[in-house]
Amino acid sequence: MTTNLRQRMTEDMQVRNLSLLTQSSYVQQVSMFARHFNKSPEVLGIEDIRNYQLYLTNQKKLNASSIKVAVSAIRFLYRVTLGRPWDFDEVVPSPKKPRTLPIILSPEEVVHFLGCVTNVKQRTILTICYAAGLRISEAVHLMPSAIDRQRMVIRIEQGKGRKDRYVMLSPKLLQVLIAYWHAVRPKGCLFPGDIPGQPITRGAVELACQAAHARSGLCKPVTPHSLRHAFAVHLLEAGTDLRTIQLLMGHSSLDTTARYLRIATSKVCATTSPLDLLPRPIPIPIDAKQIEPSPF
């Protein structure tokens, strides 16, 4: 991608107030697209885009989420920056993402996992991800001024979609934050990184999460986002209504929040199986006392 085209695309994203993370991602994706053909995107057309999507799918074996990012970047370039009059749903189709369910940690597993995070700063960040349902990018960019102990809320500024919101400040989380403050005495950012004036990186927290997961011995996968998922499901199972959870998590659509209804087990477990309603028990061919212990 030429310097002029990169500059034009960046300016188009800036005037639309896209986040810096989105801008960086889109420029990277379009640059990879151009390098694949060793040509400027200005001379590439519909068939080239189709071939690139097939390359990402069949040769690179990328998942639908990764391809979706590439497609969004290419769509922006050709629709906005280059102004191509195409039917983009037809020309640059976005892959359908499989409706998979995240694996949810139980409350006991959350306690155990957080206890395995040895660094106080990283443990505090991951605790906030669970206690307030924050994205990792939101947690690492918190400033001390975001903690409002008078109103017992945390102000999340410019979250995903450039939207501000408030989340609850748990009394227990407040005590964790106070203890962290006295232990670390951070300057500027609440969670400063190695570069003066800059917050800790997402990568550093993700590495700490991986190390804690290895120490914990948990079979379930754990990422910072796993704690956000657990926040939503545990609230839902405790009786919090879906609209409140949507506001706390900063979801634009209630449909995004509604997927947690498929994960919450409180209603599932409270539903009686028809097997238990049969008039007589079904025969069990093996004496359960004589077989080896089962894995469940």
Describe the residue ranges of each PLM region:
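Conserved catalytic core of the tyrosine transesterase superfamily
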Residues: M1-F296
